[in-house]
Amino acid sequence: MERIDGEDIDYFLLQIEEVFNEAADRENDDGEWMIFSGFRIWVPKIFSLADQESASEIFWSEYRPDIMLFTDKKTEGMTLQTLGGMGIIGAGGGHPIESVKQLLETIDDRNVYYDMGVTDGNVKIYWIEYKSFAGEERVYNLLFLFQTEAGDILGTFYCIFEEYEKWKPIAWEMIQSIREEPDEGI
């Protein structure tokens, strides 16, 4: 990754803003919109919903996320979990990712945190980027939180750390596509 100096920062911010704005209204044949309880998300064709067998290969615990999307290699994926009435977003008035970060720090002090923030799109999404470890492997993570009628949703995009430059734009495109999808009781 190339270092930027003070003169380049405005250009860098404009590029990032352009990437986020492009992804917002994505409608093409490279993927599909998937609708879940209270929201929809654009998912590239390379990802598919995991069945129980695939999920158990990645997540050994019985307590798995509600929604799991994997590539065929299963080294890249996105998980989404409804937190229900836990109320992480809006509780305490602070940045909700701060409490998630504190929890992550207690689990593994080897994690390396890069950046965190909040999007200002259709759905307010709080996020944090960090590197974690699975055994000896380094893993890039983009963890995010947003709110729907069903409650708070916790999502994570992960990939092998050495491939994050390839997958990070795809992860952001998926996250930026999240839209509210009111439950019409049908």
Language-model segments: which ranges?
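Short beta-strand/turn segments that mark the catalytic/cofactor-handling region
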Residues: 128
